[in-house]
Amino acid sequence: MLADVFEKIMGD
């Protein structure tokens, strides 16, 4: 979901 994508771009 969207949250997963944000976590990937954040890296942590």
Curated annotation (Swiss-Prot):
Coiled coil: none annotated. The keyword Membrane does not apply. Its main location: secreted. One of its GO terms (cellular component) is extracellular region. It comes from the Eukaryota. It is found in: Secreted. Keywords: Secreted. Expressed by the skin glands. Possesses weak insulin-releasing activity. This is Insulinotropic peptide 2.
